[in-house]
Amino acid sequence: MEQFTVQLNNATCTVCIGAGVLGRAGALLRQHVPQVRRWALAADEAVSAFYGEWVQGSLRAAGLESRLFLLPQGESAKTPEAWVSLCRRILDSGFDRSCGVVTLGGGACGDAAGFAAASLLRGVPLAHIPTTLLA
């Protein structure tokens, strides 16, 4: 696995690439975002069918709690209705400012869930597990 850090204006972002990263998602989240123990896993419906349980198992193995929230595939994930639905489901599940959002899917999923993470409760930590090159 390769890791590198991207320096932004006020923040840094660690990028992990390589074989086995998906199975190590939980351990990597614990390492890089240690203050978060509960994650809202926002996943594209199609991607979740293949990798959702695998990622949730990785989070459980790392001692992290997660709950899966499905998003529509593609650009339909970025509609106001989909965003409101995601935010309501996350909040109705008892998530608070101590929680984070992790995305599993392509660019539209990352955009929609990233916007939810930025706007929920004045912003919560966000991590991405992209499944496409553009994501």
Give names to the regions the model predicted.
Residues M1-G100:
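ATP/NTP phosphate-donor binding region
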